[in-house]
């Protein structure tokens, strides 16, 4: 556990959501929402995640038990710094997966924001990956919806040249403290049209997420998950150190966070 804490201090994150005056936890577990921060403001949100799944895929979760810590920060109204490090077991090895992104967002009208940025990840397979993300989100007083397209460039010749990942999240506030959402994640979407896709085919995850964040409190609890489906199958498979399960799976994830 102490090793986890030490290594997690350098971690880099994937997710973030901010309110108008301070960094706030996202009601989503798998999706990124562009922030709506105030000019010249800076704030951060730290969190701890615990997840369990079988036949999972990154970035949804590590296989079996995964722990993670992270920080999500905003600087002004446009800049987002995301940091997360996860710890999971691959075979008999305990491995660390740091991820990080820098995103820049802009307003389009009164309720829509778009974002784009770049980042880096080291997967549990010990493959270095360069990231690019494009996102759009719409937030109102009672609801929010956002979508992301991620391009991942593995720095390994044993993988696809570029992996396509999408995330979609839609939430509705129930009272002042609870947000109920539906999230979906798709990985290796090139498997739908590329017969030579090398990472086992496209995989999809979809399910509910519930977030509890009392207005007067600085903490939030989020729980969610869903089934993982093999949408396509590829006759090609790389020899990279990466799990390519042949069956469907599932993932459950929880997060506890604090604003400061």
Can you annotate each of these PLM segments?
Residues 4, 14, 27-31:
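Detector for intrinsically disordered, low-structure N-terminal pre-sequences
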Residues 167, 171:
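Pocket-lining segment of extracytoplasmic ligand-binding domains
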Residues 1-11:
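Bacterial N-terminal signal peptides that target proteins for export
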Residues 23-124, 130-132, 137-147, 152, ...:
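Transmembrane beta-barrel domains of Gram-negative outer membranes and organellar outer membranes
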